[in-house]
């Protein structure tokens, strides 16, 4: 198994249908529960273990998910309310070194739970036309809301797999 990409990299070149969108939204909606159930019994030593050599710790992954998904939510709102807005990327590696990534995971778990409720509520209210709206990432180009939903459904599963595969390898 590839420890960096335990579920593979995001790939989707097909037609983004309502069925696929709903599956992706369900995956985003399920992440807070799955994440909490996976990490709730881990101790500080386990939380401060890297999921792979040179990778983030479990604690950093959890805080990263909160930061990344907050950015996704804001990008969604920008794409809904503006015409192909240019979004500001951030340096996730630098953010992972900031002090708040040392805080208890419960803070980010609560944030992720609340954020995903709002995010999924908004996503479920979008029309098929809304799904085609885009934002422009300076490095990746224009991305539709529909595709971005898929990216973030994958993103949550990707990082959850980092944690679950570590737990399995360590027999936690």
Swiss-Prot record:
User: Which GO molecular function annotation, any one, does this entry have?
Assistant: zinc ion binding
Signal peptide bounds: none
Localization terms from the record: Cytoplasm
Question: What enzyme class is recorded for this protein?
Answer: hydrolase
| Keywords for this protein | Cytoplasm, Hydrolase, Metal-binding, Zinc
User: What are its cofactors?
Assistant: Zn(2+)
Q: Which SUPFAM superfamilies match?
A: DinB/YfiT-like putative metalloenzymes
Q: Is Disulfide bond among the key words of this record?
A: no
Which InterPro entries has this protein been placed in? DinB-like (IPR024775), DinB/YfiT-like (IPR034660), Put_metal_dep_hydrolase_YfiT (IPR023774)
Cofactor binding notes: Binds 1 zinc ion per subunit.
| Enzyme Commission number(s) of this protein | 3.-.-.-
Q: Name one GO cellular component term.
A: cytoplasm
Q: Where does Zn(2+) bind?
A: 64, 155, 159
| Superkingdom of the source species | Bacteria
Q: How does it assemble?
A: Homodimer.
Q: Which family does it belong to?
A: Belongs to the metal hydrolase YfiT family.
Record function comment: Possible metal-dependent hydrolase.
Q: What is this protein called?
A: Putative metal-dependent hydrolase OB0782
């Amino acid at each position: 198994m590839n420890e960096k990409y335990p579920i593979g990299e995001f790939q989707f070149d097909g037609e983004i249908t309502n069925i696929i969108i709903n599956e992706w939204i369900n995956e985003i909606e399920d992440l807070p529960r799955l994440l909490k159930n996976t990490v709730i019994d881990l101790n500080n030593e386990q939380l401060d273990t890297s999921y792979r050599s040179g990778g983030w710790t479990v604690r950093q992954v959890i805080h990263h998910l909160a930061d990344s998904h907050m950015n996704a939510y804001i990008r969604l709102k920008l794409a809904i309310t503006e015409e192909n807005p240019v979004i500001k990327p951030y340096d996730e590696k630098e953010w992972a070194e900031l002090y708040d990534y040392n805080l208890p995971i419960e803070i980010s778990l609560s944030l992720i739970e609340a954020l995903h409720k709002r995010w999924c509520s908004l996503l479920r209210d979008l029309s098929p036309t809304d799904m085609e709206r885009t934002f422009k990432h300076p490095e990746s180009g224009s991305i539709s809301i529909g595709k971005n939903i898929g990216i973030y459904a994958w993103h949550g599963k990707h990082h959850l797999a980092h944690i679950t595969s570590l737990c399995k390898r360590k027999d936690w």
